[in-house]
Amino acid sequence: MNGDLYQELKKRISGEVRFDKVSRFLYSTDASIYEIEPIGVVIPRTHEDVFAVMEITRDFGVPLLPRGAGTSLAGQTVGEAVVVDMSKYLNRVLEVNTEERWALVEPGVVQEQLNLHLKPMGYLFGPDTSTANRATLGGMMGNNSAGSHSIVYGKTIDHVLETHVVLASGEQRVFKDMSFEEAAQMSGIEGRISDIVANNREEIDRRFPRIQRRVSGYNLDEFVRGKKFNLSKLIVGSEGTLAAVHQARVRIEPRPAAVALCVIHFKELVESIRATDIILPFNPSAIELVDDLILSLARGSLELSRQMDFIDGTPAAILLVEFYGENEAELRSKIESLEAALKREKFGYSYVRAFDAAEQTRIWKLRKAGLGLLLGMKGERKPIAFVEDCAVEPSKLAKFLVRFQEVIAKYDTTAGYYGHASVGCLHIRPLINTKSRREIQVMKDMTDDITDLVLEFNGSMSGEHGDGLARSHLNERLFGHQIYKAFQDVKLAFDPHSRMNPGKIVNGPPMTENLRYGEKYSTVFVNTHYDFSREGGLATAVELCNGAAVCRKQNEGTMCPSYMVTKEDEHSTRGRANYMREILSGKTGIEEFSGQKLHDALDLCLECKGCKAECPSNVDMAKLKYEFLAHYNEAHGTPLRSKLFAGIHNLSRIASIWPAMANTMMARPIVRQALDKYLGIDARRKLPPIAPQTFESWFRKRSRPPKATTANPAGKVILFHDTFIDFNYPEIGKATTTLLEAAGYEVAISERQCCGRPMISKGLPEEARANAAFNVGKLAPFVEQGYSIVGCEPSCILTFRDEYPDLLKGHAVDAVAKASFLLEEFIVREKKEGRWKLDLKRQTTKALIHGHCHEKALIGSRFLKETMALAYTVEEIDSGCCGMAGSFGFEKEHYDISMAIGQRRLFPAVEKQPDAIVVAPGVSCRQQVEHATGRKALHPAEALVLAL
């Protein structure tokens, strides 16, 4: 049947229809602990496609599951159904009416995209989940999402005015406000829902908790306590079980005039919750909890650790308390009054204020990363989502927390704590190993205990994360038999054959079925070329991906450049990790780990390392790709082009013997066309020139070899002259030498080989290991003599720190890694230590700076900013990846996507400011800027030497 279904869908749908094994793998998980392989995937391009897929699945009698970004935490978006992915094409803001304060949107619109669209108009969409940079409006409606500011804006249900839906029958409907009397007179769904409400009115009023945060079950309370009859109130929070939304009208709110944050530090977790009783009367716009477990994990995150200077000491918990106001003076007054009240009652030990928008964004980033940080914990026990979304009346929250902790202690485990203290909804995640039969039983027993506790406190098992596979089985117990029967009647009214996302909200399976990592889960051993002990092994490195989908963000940072252009989950970090996990768990043959399908999935990975820093779980897809390519080359042979790119150092060395001839040859159209045709090196790319004199030749003719000792060890530098500095751009090495010597440093060079980066990138780890061993052997003695190793090319010098320890072991490699610095990092370090005393002349020209991906991931861009600020007014381009990525952009099959990545943000920013100089440490970045815009970008050393 599936073959006929596939053919019918292909025939009638203009979008994409995918029933292949890889696509089914990619959509078998979300951000929950569950995994169910779907029948197939449809990606509608138009509204008509949505109508057609509903009709076709109806005719074939198969289930259907609407899906957005797949960030659901309770398993709402996985199931044995045809998954309809609304996120790729149906993502337009169709209309905005600021006078009437509404926006008409398609379901795939990302929350952050909508707010960016509304920002110039002075409006926003109120509910703001921590997944705002990838969660879709359709998903938020399905889940009835809320977020950090629900104390002001409520839940999504409070902002949906009208829904355009398709029912399981294929019927198209528009649901909007009408009177209860009108609904009661209607036949069809309106009349049936009116009858259900009338027959259960008293029980609904009695059994639904009177708290702001309750999304469990169907929203029948809206028809008892609400003023209008609107079936959109049932669609919202229905998790796709009633209908598919293809368009919606949502309310928008005026943006606050001014915003401020106060970060309150506490010595005890419970103390922080008790403090909310004092904070709430000051009318904050948010009160968010972050516990010490998340803070400690953040300190181990490459990106977040660089942004935690607002944390004072080692608190057991912090509260982020936010206020809206008309101006900063009003906000200062509010915060001062709050601090005085807290101090009177002896709550908190430190109060950090943030009035600057950039500083607030930095602080909020920590809170939003809480989920991913927790799931990135090492070890088999993970702080998983199953009882993580309980909500009670805020005044009862402290007592509820203490009782919850008693339950956790009963089962001999711990938990991570974060969430929305303002509205009594805490995300408490007990650590459970779902690969253990005993702990799966613990998960079930603990759920029973917590359900009893929630009922005792008249709360909700879900304040915003929904029922899904994790909690649907609890709804009869939570609401009673009569209301549960009413829920089943609602389902029948909309979907009599139970085709819409079955098994959610009603008739749910046991919570311990369909676990992604269950007691039978195991992995196949793979003998690796790189050391994965830091990650806990290859399989564990893959399993770090929890599905939170931060890699689907589109408007900021580096991760994930290929997804930002393709909008394909397959080309996101999550998609690639999912497929690797399927292979390593034995669901396909292990030969797939060196197979073509995985090669295709990894092909567009630029090895930028953005995920290593920006993924809260620190998934290092670049390293995983290096490992895969090594196995792929072993199985299939290394392509000639890969060998040539990997051997760029030796090729350049040979070309440098006859530089003029080499340049003439490379410039000839016939040669470039031949490279294009036979090697796939795109003829549209300009190959780097061979310099008339190598940097090493220049350097050795103008200096003596370094002495073994010196009076000032801190002032001795080995300049690692990488391949491009030596053979292509010696002016950068000359500028670096001039700059360092002007600052009083003794500069020397050492015998060396290529850093190994090109070999690593092309899947040749043994060749890279040999080069690493040679370089460490030559450089370690200098380190012992007090030399610092300074490099100009981020991807080269940072290889010493990131990859060498995975290729080699021993004191020498650790010492070399510790002593290696990027030029701008070295300058900032030396200045901080008081050793850099060189004064540079202020320049009138602005410097637009673009950091290299590896630099931004491994050390951050602040060193580049601080160094360039010594002489220039600096503006950092939030440009993400430039798209070149070493040889990637030179490869014919990658040229278009390479340019598309750069065109997203980098190229327009460069072209917008023709009077500014462009500064980029990475050779690939400078090449990309020149090829795309015609402008020559400078290395930081070249720009700084102009200011001597």
Q: Where are the model-predicted features located?
A:
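Iron-sulfur cluster-binding electron-transfer modules in prokaryotic oxidoreductases
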Residues: 495, 502, 517, 622-948
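C-terminal substrate-binding/cap subdomain adjacent to the FAD-binding core in PCMH-type
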Residues: 32, 140-142, 150-153, 160-366, ...
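Ferredoxin-type iron-sulfur electron-transfer modules and their immediate structural context
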Residues: 381, 456-461, 468-604, 627-637, ...
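N-terminal flexible segment immediately upstream of the FAD-binding catalytic core
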Residues: 1-59, 69-101, 130, 153, ...
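N-terminal glycine-rich flavin-associated loop
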Residues: 9, 32-64, 82, 86-129, ...
